[in-house]
UniProtKB/Swiss-Prot annotation:
Entry keyword Signal: yes
Protein family (similarity comment): Belongs to the Ole e I family.
Primary location class: secreted
Source domain of life: Eukaryota
Keywords: Disulfide bond, Secreted, Signal
Protein name according to UniProt: Olee1-like protein
Positions of disulphide bridges: 35-106, 38-150, 59-94
Any Pfam family hit: Pollen_Ole_e_1
Span of the signal peptide: 1-23
Length: 166
């Protein structure tokens, strides 16, 4: 009896781990959308998070850029979105992009060719991240005109407002 337990226990552990390793992957992409009240294209103390903004997740083939997976989401009252994603997308480039603003006065997306307009995320178990949650960088829409208090807020950060505000 004792010998059979000694043999069965490691076998059971091994089979459990094997099943876990080959289980279907499920990820959750989380991020925030903000209104860039200072047109700096980064979060400041004057930025506000946007309820009802729409974002899109797209995973494309690395070779030809063919769309493999797509999902849309909307932010909650804290400006946060959460997109469930089934499957491992190790061989694809996955990015979150702004789709639609919930505020007509804060709906501009930068046209600067040097700026990234999306947040790239890794949706695979083979990257050393142990949790299924993937955090994307914050994405922001810009206000049409910066708030008057932006210059002071930027000086507090040690920045020259004329160099930063677009």
């Amino acid at each position: 009896m004792a010998k059979s337990i000694i043999i069965q226990a490691p076998a059971l552990c091994f089979l459990s781990l094997l099943g876990f390793a080959y289980s279907e992957s499920r990820f959750f992409v989380e991020g925030k959308v903000y209104c860039d009240n200072c047109r700096t294209q980064f979060v400041t103390k004057l930025s506000t998070y946007m309820k009802g903004a729409k974002v899109s997740l797209e995973c494309r083939n690395r070779e030809g850029g063919t769309l493999i997976y797509s999902s849309d989401s909307e932010t909650d009252k804290s400006g946060t979105y959460r997109i469930p994603v089934d499957g491992d997308h190790e061989e694809e480039i996955c990015e979150i992009a702004l789709k639609k603003s919930s505020d007509p006065d804060c709906s501009e997306v930068s046209k600067d060719p040097f700026l990234k307009k999306s947040a790239r995320i890794s949706l695979t178990k083979n990257n050393g991240i142990s949790t299924p949650v993937r955090l994307a960088n914050p994405l922001g829409f810009m206000k049409k005109k910066p708030l008057p208090e932006c210059a002071k807020a930027l000086r507090e950060l040690g920045m020259n407002p004329d160099d930063v505000i677009q």
